[in-house]
């Protein structure tokens, strides 16, 4: 890393499972957690802060750079031990996994029904507990998880839910990360056989199960869905290469690709561009407080961002069924400007029925 920096390379470092780099000595046995056997002996180990402080002192302090660390099973309070803003913080941002557990138990290969309440709790706990003390890393996709439209959205309403999911996290406080393919709505890959999967983590799951049952699980949970070649065009190999790609191309590339998205003004890609431009133009997104509404709902995620000068209201429906929305008591939508929505023909009423996977962003200033 130091050699890269000395050559002018590497303004941002991502450090994988950083909380695992210090282990308790003695190789003790553990039988508490069948999924993460032994994790209490190597997660947040005895020398973790010593190692990270050494790396900061000997490498990071010599350069103007940013560090992002991945940390499974970390809570907001534990994350602050690493990222709390100070002259000696060890990491700038931490990638947590709680927002990836809204439809599974700890790992994608132990699925359960999607729960918006679990997702909202993850978002809200990190927004509130890090406020004024640390900076959030915001994401919905990466190389270790299936495609988010197939998980938290709807392939039937791919465009609508893809846009809604963008809104759900792009207006939170923190730095958003967008994974390749997410910005134009790639979905899960569904091959015909389990033998087509290459990820070792996937292939090790339930080898004794019948093929049909394993295939259904892999279709839903495999991180290979995030590792198929990016779909640039509807041409051969999705325009990724004129040679032979290292891995299978998702068969839906004829309909879902960058070229198509660029020429469609209503595409997910162009929606992301609008949302990012708005985010950059609004100080309230960077500096505003966070307040969640509709906490009891399993269909709506509604939150506000507020400074003395601006108030932002974000409304996201996570269902294809109509849901009655009533503006919170301290908001009048008629007095606010509708900045962004994934539907045409929107009227500014304090009470309305949502359309499938509808999203709206309002501003008052």
Feature-to-residue mapping (PLM):
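Carbohydrate-interacting/catalytic domains
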Residues: 175-178, 184, 189-365
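Active-site rim elements
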Residues: 40-44, 148-160, 255-266
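Short acidic (Asp/Glu) and glycine-rich catalytic loops that position anionic groups and cofactors
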Residues: 31-34, 102-103, 144-147, 248-256
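Alpha-helical packing segments of well-folded alpha/beta enzyme cores
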Residues: 1, 48-55, 122-126, 165, ...
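Short, solvent-exposed beta-strand-terminating loops
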Residues: 11-24, 234-238
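Aromatic- and acidic-residue-enriched carbohydrate-binding clefts of CAZyme catalytic domains
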Residues: 18-46
């Amino acid at each position: 890393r130091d050699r890269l920096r000395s050559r002018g390379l590497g303004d941002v470092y991502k450090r994988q499972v950083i909380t695992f780099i210090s282990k308790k000595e003695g190789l003790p046995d553990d039988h508490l957690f069948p999924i993460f056997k032994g994790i209490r002996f190597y997660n947040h180990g005895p020398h973790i802060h010593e190692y990270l402080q050494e790396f900061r002192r000997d490498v990071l302090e010599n350069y103007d750079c940013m560090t992002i660390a991945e940390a499974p099973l970390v809570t907001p309070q534990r994350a602050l031990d690493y990222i709390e803003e100070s002259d000696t913080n060890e990491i700038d941002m931490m990638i947590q996994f709680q927002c990836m557990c809204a439809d599974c138990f700890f790992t994608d290969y132990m699925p359960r029904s999607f729960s918006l309440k679990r997702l909202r709790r993850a978002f809200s706990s990190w927004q509130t507990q890090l406020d004024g003390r640390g900076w959030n890393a915001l994401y919905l996709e990466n190389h270790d998880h299936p495609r988010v439209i197939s998980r938290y959205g709807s392939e039937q309403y791919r465009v609508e839910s893809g846009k809604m999911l963008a809104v759900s996290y792009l207006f939170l406080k923190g730095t958003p990360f967008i994974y390749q393919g997410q910005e134009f709505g790639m979905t899960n890959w569904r091959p015909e056989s389990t033998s087509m999967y290459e990820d070792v983590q996937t292939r090790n799951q339930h080898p004794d199960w019948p093929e049909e049952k394993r295939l259904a699980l892999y279709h839903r949970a495999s991180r290979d869905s995030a590792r198929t070649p990016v779909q640039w065009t509807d041409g051969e190999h999705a325009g990724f290469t004129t040679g032979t790609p290292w891995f299978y191309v998702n068969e839906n590339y004829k309909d879902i690709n960058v070229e198509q998205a660029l020429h469609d003004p209503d595409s997910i890609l162009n929606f992301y561009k609008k949302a990012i431009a708005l985010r950059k133009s609004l100080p309230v997104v960077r500096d505003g407080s966070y307040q969640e509404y509709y906490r009891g709902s399993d269909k709506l995620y509604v939150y506000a961002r507020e400074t003395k000068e601006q108030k932002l209201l974000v409304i996201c429906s996570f269902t294809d069924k109509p849901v009655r929305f009533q503006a919170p008591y301290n908001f009048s939508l008629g007095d606010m400007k509708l900045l962004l929505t994934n539907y045409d023909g929107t009227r500014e009423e304090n009470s309305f029925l949502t359309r499938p996977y509808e999203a709206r962003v309002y501003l008052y200033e």
